[in-house]
Amino acid sequence: MSATAVHSLWTTASGVTSAAPGNSFTAPKIEYTQLMPVLIIVVAAVLGILVEAFVPRRARYHTQLFLTVVAVAGSFAAIVGLAAGGYGTTDAGIVAMGAIAIDGPTLFLQGTILLVAMVALFTFAERRLDPGSNGNRVDSFAAQAGSVPGGEGEKAAVRAGFTTTEVFPLLLFSVAGLLVFPAANDLLTLFIALEVFSLPLYLLCAVARRKRLMSQEAAVKYFLLGAFSSAFLLFGIALLYGYAGSLSYADIANVVDGSVLEIDPALADTMGNDALLLIGGAMILTGLLFKVGAVPFHMWTPDVYQGAPTPVTGFMAAATKVAAFGALLRLLYVALPGLAWDLRPVMWAVAIVTMLGGAIVAITQTDIKRLLAYSSIAHAGFILAGVIAASPEGISSVLFYLLAYSFVTVGAFAVVTLVRDAGGEATHLSKWAGLGRRSPLVAAVFAVFLLAFAGIPLTSGFSGKFAVFKAAAEGGAGALVVVGVLSSAVAAFFYIRVIVLMFFSEPKADGPTVAVPSPLTMTTIAVGVAVTLVLGLAPQYFLDLASQAGVFVR
């Protein structure tokens, strides 16, 4: 091509550009104030990576712990500031060019996630439970995550007292994704947030100090099944985009309602196709139900909960359920409210088999972590009853249940870390026989958590179940409530069985010991017990708070 031709093309292009100023690039509008809780966590996570690169190894633990505590506390303070400024009620809105919603459910769920992250963080930082080599204090994580289990590299790292302090920035990255997940206002943001919190969790599951092969197996299972569910979610997103011509929740809802104002010419043949809507919605629902651990998408839960480091299990069991149910609520109430009656039979079936399946299979478990895993599956079914209510009361009841369940879960897994034998944590139920005689306080605390799981009055579990069952009954799901009550009765059997085992069985001579933790784990357990009792004895303030927060912005 000649120089004259090139000049002509350049001149023509310049003329077109100058003649069409409306096509000029517009800088994105980012509301940094409303996004401050997430930004604080992301900045701290990046700083945590720099700490790993430049801070001497012996100083990393305290530096990372301080940085993580400050970041989580600062982010929670930002949440409180936004709530006080009315961003959860009167000033709620859509920010980041439509990608994120800042409203009552967002702030309530983000606050819950941050509180869970703080108490779980203390179990991450615990260094007094496992006897270290040469007097070194070690935590629950592998001395050198990249070494071969049982190899010379691992042995040398253990002798040197190394710890995997990378778990702190990984935790922060996961928290960042969890904060965005329930706030996502379009499908692309939803998928990105899912991957941001999932990838660090895959790594955290693989770095247990004891039983490393089981830990790595759990991580591989979680990764493979998680990738499979992400594929379902992504394919569903593609189908919904073909249906609506947009990834925005509001635009999708408009097309579902038949109030769309503009049709994308490139998607004229697919927009409004009900088959794309139903299949795409079902596939996205599948991806989210995998994250909450609902049947039949629950198969990863017992193996991962059992194999992962127990502090990671506690955090994952609580925080991911909070974020995933928040995302599920927003999808159903904001993007797909027009599909409520179409999805209702499916949601009913999933809730019923989840409640019954989790409760019945838990009876057969002999490992305390697997028992708690199936317990979490049953609780996912109870929470789905509130989701199915399809009412403001249903939303607020789910928010309250998630708050109550989270602290009970983290506290219960914190207690599990204390009961130990020569191989680490003693998770087989037979080893918990007579624990009430050997360590009455620890057994009593664990009994409180088990009674809360069972929904016994005066605990947070009773208040939460009463709220979701009441909302479901008022929403026309009375039969579902009956199934839920029956499932709760079945579940109460195996919870009480553990209590009987601890207090009314003879302790074995070679039974486990109860480690004396640092104030960090003591704080986690104490906070869990306090929240469990407060939400059980005086829940009204928190029920009102959840009710005020239970309004989605569109």
Swiss-Prot record:
EC class (word): translocase
The protein's role, per its UniProt record: NDH-1 shuttles electrons from NADH, via FMN and iron-sulfur (Fe-S) centers, to quinones in the respiratory chain. The immediate electron acceptor for the enzyme in this species is believed to be a menaquinone. Couples the redox reaction to proton translocation (for every two electrons transferred, four hydrogen ions are translocated across the cytoplasmic membrane), and thus conserves the redox energy in a proton gradient.
Bilayer topology term: Multi-pass membrane protein
Family indicated by similarity: Belongs to the complex I subunit 2 family.
Chain's gene name: nuoN3
E.C. code: 7.1.1.-
NCBIfam families: NDH_I_N, PRK05777.1-4
Main location (coarse class): membrane
InterPro entries: NADH-Q_OxRdtase_suN/2, ND/Mrp_TM
Keywords: Cell membrane, Membrane, NAD, Quinone, Translocase, Transmembrane, Transmembrane helix, Transport
Transmembrane segments: 35-55, 65-85, 105-125, 161-181, 187-207, 222-242, 275-295, 322-342, 345-365, 371-391, 398-418, 442-462, 476-496, 525-545
Record GO cellular component, one term: plasma membrane
Protein's UniProt name: NADH-quinone oxidoreductase subunit N 3
Quaternary structure, from the entry: NDH-1 is composed of 14 different subunits. Subunits NuoA, H, J, K, L, M, N constitute the membrane sector of the complex.
